[in-house]
Amino acid sequence: MRKFIPVFLLSVFVLGACSSWNKTATGTAAGAGAGAALGAVIGGLIGHDGKSAAIGAAIGTAVGGGAGALIGRKMDKKAEELAALNAKVETVTDANGLEAIKVTFDNGILFATNKATLSAQSQKELKEFAAKMADMPDTDVTVYGHTDNTGSAEVNEKLSTQRANAVAGYLQSCGIASSRIKAEGKSYTMPVADNATKEGRAQNRRVEVYVSANEKMIQAAENGTLK
């Protein structure tokens, strides 16, 4: 039986072997949080240095606890399915205070050093991810590319953007609509570990894929029709 580890991030870190997914918040609590802060950016991606970026689009209206619970259960179920990937899957909180999913891919698996061309293995992993997302068209997918702090900010900004775009483009080719996908390079501005060590730099070289409820899913949850 998998144990849930509290986190406040929304990513999946691909390791050498299949990893478990980690639950961070229940749908009820997340929905209640959104209701308490109208349209506030509550959730996000929080780096080692404390910087953060919101995940998903804030809809500007309160989301009730009941709707949050429905979305939470749907995200839990999908996270369990995604756990079959060669990845670590976590549930986190998005910009509306709702449960979302984070998938983080190690750049060492996705790309060759200083390259932005997807490897055959990474294409296989991303194709499997896209296939498992086919039954959730009412979600948004956000892709962030990250690097360590080796090299100039300009070089790392370009590389992280190219890698994020490569992942987003491949997911589109696998059937995820371009209207659902956002890609952005973060360079080394949001580390999750200490760049002073080799191990820390390895953790910081990653691509994160975030899955969050879009307005259509939220509306269905509010109406009680979300399945």
Task: Annotate each PLM feature.
Residues R2-L10, L38:
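Sec-dependent signal peptide recognition
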Residues S19-E81:
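Short, low-complexity, glycine-enriched hydrophobic/amphipathic alpha-helices that associate
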Residues A37-L38, K74, K78, S122-E125, ...:
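Stable alpha-helical elements in mature extracytoplasmic
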Residues G97-I101, F105-N107, N114, P137-T139, ...:
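Envelope-exposed proteins and targeting segments
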Residues H146-A220:
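Periplasmic OmpA-like peptidoglycan-binding domain that tethers envelope proteins to the cell wall
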